[in-house]
Regions:
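Extracytoplasmic
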Residues: 33-41, 61, 71-73, 81-83, ...
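Outer-membrane beta-barrel translocator/receptor signature
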Residues: 94-95, 110-112, 123-203, 209-215, ...
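Non-catalytic regulatory/gating segments with a bias toward low-complexity or hydrophobic composition
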Residues: 38, 46, 58, 114-119, ...
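Acidic/polar loop-and-plug regions of large Gram-negative outer-membrane beta-barrel proteins
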Residues: 185-189, 202-273, 277-279, 283-308
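Short, glycine-/polar-rich solvent-exposed loops and beta-turns at beta-strand/coil boundaries
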Residues: 34, 57-77, 92, 127-130, ...
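Short acidic/polar hinge/loop motifs at secondary-structure boundaries
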Residues: 66, 75, 91-118, 136-141
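Short, acidic, small-residue-rich periplasmic hinge/interaction motif at the N-terminus
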Residues: 1-47
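Transmembrane beta-barrel outer-membrane domains
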Residues: 69, 104, 155-159, 194-198, ...
Length: 308
């Protein structure tokens, strides 16, 4: 059961396009009516394409260029500019991809959708550049019945993953509802000597104070523990000016290198819905990213015959 008039929610629709989006103007409109170039990566598409990080989502978004600096860091660009405007549930936040605090590694299992508006977005994000804005919209406890979704999967490079998504009413009427989402993943990589373990947890409580007023409180946490992390890329040229030809699996990360990171956040929002699809919302949000790096950096022009 979805909240009244919430046409922007994508979970449960089974669709690759939203019924409406408020990403550009703050008003729920169809993509055709929206006066900017908008892509909404829905919950169905995230599941079908097995996206497991924000980098995966951005790589599948039209008009977005994704470049990885090394094993942990990615940059996202649009229309020739680096993307600097990021939001959680429409609330601007600060990302710094250069320090690898877990931003691009965020697991999309906790999100209903990811909205990308290409071009200038000063109306909703304030000062920035004309690249794009990225809005990560969290899941909510909308079901008035107990629901459970669990999965276990295995894939290439010794990738193992387990997920749990539980929703339940917390009182007889279902006016207070809770939801817990969790994931654990252990994987190696096409890169030599690299592996990563991550843990994800998200919990939210939604309470209908009246038929038109809803209070939401939630918390999210993700811990990334990679080993064999690399720092930076490889030279394009040998010392004699010739082009290098490295193996795709080559990794400068040593047994002791790592680039651990944690992402945590909390939020509380109060929304009141009026007639004719008008609503007012107040939100408090907190987020914190931390990293702990033990890294090895190599640079220079290697000799073709003798090596670095």
């Amino acid at each position: 059961v979805e909240g009244q008039g919430d046409l922007t929610t994508t979970e449960g629709t089974g669709s690759y396009t939203p019924r409406a989006t408020a990403a550009s103007t703050g008003l729920p409109m169809s993509l055709r009516e929206t006066p900017q170039s908008v892509t909404v990566v829905t919950r169905q598409r995230i599941d079908d394409e097995n996206m497991r990080s924000l980098a995966d989502v951005m790589a599948s978004t039209p008009g977005i260029s994704v470049q990885n600096y090394d094993s942990e860091r990615y940059s996202f660009n649009s229309r020739g500019f680096a993307i600097s405007n990021y939001m959680y549930d429409g609330i601007p936040t600060s990302f710094d991809m250069g320090y690898a605090g877990g931003e691009s590694s965020q697991d999309p299992i906790i999100y209903d959708r990811v909205e990308v508006v290409r071009g200038a977005t000063g109306l909703l994000t304030g000062a920035g550049n004309p690249s794009a804005s990225v809005n990560l919209v969290r899941k909510h406890a909308t079901s008035r019945e107990f629901t459970a979704d669990m999965s276990v999967s295995a894939g290439s490079w010794d990738t193992y993953r387990a997920t749990v998504d539980l929703s339940s009413p917390l009182n007889a009427s279902g006016s207070v509802r809770g939801r817990i989402v969790s994931a654990y993943q252990d994987n190696h990589s096409f890169l030599d000597n690299y592996e990563n373990r991550k843990k994800v947890f998200y919990g939210v409580v939604d309470a209908d104070l009246t038929s038109r007023t809803t209070l939401s409180v939630g918390f999210n946490y993700q811990d990334n523990q990679p080993k064999g992390s690399s720092w930076g890329g490889f030279p394009l040229w040998y010392a004699d000016g010739g082009r290098t030809d490295w193996k795709r699996s080559l990794n400068t990360g040593a047994d002791w290198t790592s680039w651990a990171s944690t992402t945590q956040g909390a939020f509380a929002s109060l929304e009141h819905r009026f007639d004719n699809d008008w609503r007012i919302q107040t939100t408090a949000s907190y987020s914190k990213n931390e990293m702990d790096g033990k890294l090895l950096y190599l640079y220079g022009l290697p000799d073709r015959n003798t090596g670095p």
